[in-house]
């Protein structure tokens, strides 16, 4: 019903909506060989093709096929590659295996849209107008992960501020109170 095929659907035959596509196989060529899996409801759009070429995957469309439908395996594979975080070292035993623990995962989607916009404005990030919250959070998190940080200096400053019970926000509010008086 939702456009995704299930195991039940494949056992019982094609669902009513996918009846015209029955018997079609995936339109992709994977590593030089045509994919033999049955085509699902997902199509190989220009956007998907662009993301595949950017990731340098060994997938191409078979020109002899008259449809653009891909199998569920390739749909999930493309989605997983598209959603994977870029890492500085590769997963196949890169330079330092403990590097993955050094990069904390920060969920910037929890922030308000106005906060994300302020971040974008402060760092002058280039985006197209009219981004929704998810797109804005993705852009900001991509930038956030690439900011170089002097960890020792930052931690020392943080500890100093905690011990002295002060923060920049406290200083600003005190100076504004003095101006009002």
From Swiss-Prot:
A motif (Nuclear localization signal (NLS)) lies at residues 83-88. Its main location: nucleus. One of its GO terms (molecular function) is phosphatidylinositol-3-phosphate binding. Gene3D superfamilies: 3.40.1800.30, 6.10.160.20. Keywords: DNA-binding, Lipid-binding, Metal-binding, Nucleus, Repressor, Transcription, Transcription regulation, Zinc, Zinc-finger. A zinc finger (Atypical) spans 26-74. Residues 85-87 are annotated as: Important for DNA and phosphoinositide binding. Residues 82-103 are annotated as: Disordered. One of its GO terms (cellular component) is nucleolus. Belongs to the SAP30 family. The zinc-finger domain mediates direct interaction with DNA and phosphoinositol phosphates (phosphoinositol 3-phosphate, phosphoinositol 4-phosphate and phosphoinositol 5-phosphate). In vitro oxydation causes reversible disulfide bond formation between Cys residues in the zinc-finger domain and reversible loss of zinc ion binding. Functions as a transcription repressor, probably via its interaction with histone deacetylase complexes. Involved in the functional recruitment of the class 1 Sin3-histone deacetylase complex (HDAC) to the nucleolus. Binds DNA, apparently without sequence-specificity, and bends bound double-stranded DNA. Binds phosphoinositol phosphates (phosphoinositol 3-phosphate, phosphoinositol 4-phosphate and phosphoinositol 5-phosphate) via the same basic sequence motif that mediates DNA binding and nuclear import. Interacts with components of the histone deacetylase complex sin3a, hdac1 and hdac2. Binds histones and nucleosomes. This is Histone deacetylase complex subunit SAP30L. The gene is sap30l.
């Amino acid at each position: 019903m939702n456009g995704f095929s299930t195991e039940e659907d494949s056992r019982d035959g094609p669902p009513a909506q996918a009846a015209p596509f029955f018997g079609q196989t995936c339109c992709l060529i994977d590593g030089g060989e045509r994919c033999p899996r049955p085509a699902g409801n997902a199509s190989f759009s220009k956007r998907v093709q662009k993301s595949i070429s950017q990731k340098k995957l060994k997938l191409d469309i078979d020109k002899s096929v008259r449809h653009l439908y891909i199998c569920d395996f390739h749909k999930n594979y493309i989605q997983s590659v598209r959603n994977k975080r870029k890492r500085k070292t590769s997963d196949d035993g890169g330079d330092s295996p403990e590097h993955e623990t050094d990069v904390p995962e920060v969920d910037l989607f929890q922030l308000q849209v106005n906060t994300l916009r302020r971040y974008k404005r402060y760092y002058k990030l280039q985006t197209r107008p009219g981004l929704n919250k998810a797109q804005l959070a993705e852009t900001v998190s991509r930038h956030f992960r690439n900011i170089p940080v002097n960890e020792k200096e930052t931690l020392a400053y943080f500890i100093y501020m905690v011990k002295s019970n002060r923060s920049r926000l406290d200083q600003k509010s005190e100076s504004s109170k003095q101006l009002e008086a």
